[in-house]
Amino acid sequence: MLALISPAKTLDYETALPTDEFTQPRLLEHSAQLIDVCRKLSASEIASLMSVSEKIATLNADRFRDWKPEFDFSNARQAIYAFKGDVYTGLDAYHLKDKDIDFAQQHLRMLSGLYGLLRPLDLMMPYRLEMGTKLKNTRGHNLYEFWDDIITNRINEDLAAIKSELLVNLASDEYYKSVNEKKIKAEIVKPVFLDQKNGKYKVISFYAKKARGLMARFIIENQLNKAEDIKAFNTEGYYFDADNSSAKELVFKRDEQ
């Protein structure tokens, strides 16, 4: 199976890295085109476009200016260690074993507004460019139009490389929209995580994001390859709810503590 997760806004370029192994992103010629567009924006235009403060906008204007596709450890780090958010708290990549990272490199992918599709050990320079950003570019009015079928085609190539016909969608809706489902040459399964609050089960963003990371870790550590195997997930109190699940959507619930 191949699992998809979203990136994170928060980045960590300080924590000591557990490995010096790395690969280079595979869609850099496309990333460079986006950088060219972003470099033409002023800090105030970035602030407006991304709905961020002037401070964050200035930081990212500097990042766009400094970006260059010769990545090494002086200016970049592996994606799985660079992202720091709720999903990555659940994934806890720093405590994965070497064999787990090897498996993840083949079976886990991170969607990205700038890099398209990242493998865990792909080096990346710091950036902020969310997939939902309405950035006018040479291919359209937003990043979905820019990436078009490029991400989808790469996913299909990665599925073929591991001889798999199962894609596990652990990404947010914003990022998963960059994938053309109709052209994916695999069965697609989406785990959904519901937490009980005041007697009702619902998606609670913080918990759901962390649970996606926990599920990614579960897949990696157990080297899963069948949709049926996912149903055994029981980390941090979650359990599979067969009655509310379907072939395409696997529901996991957690009772209120």
Swiss-Prot record:
Q: GO BP, one example?
A: response to hydroperoxide
Query: Cellular component terms, GO, for this chain's entry?
Result: cytosol
A Pfam family the protein falls into: H2O2_YaaD
Determine the domain of life of the protein's source.
Bacteria
Q: Which HAMAP family match?
A: UPF0246
Family affiliation: Belongs to the UPF0246 family.
This protein is called UPF0246 protein ACICU_02469
Source species of the chain = Acinetobacter baumannii (strain ACICU)
**Mind giving the lineage of the organism this protein is from?**
Bacteria, Pseudomonadati, Pseudomonadota, Gammaproteobacteria, Moraxellales
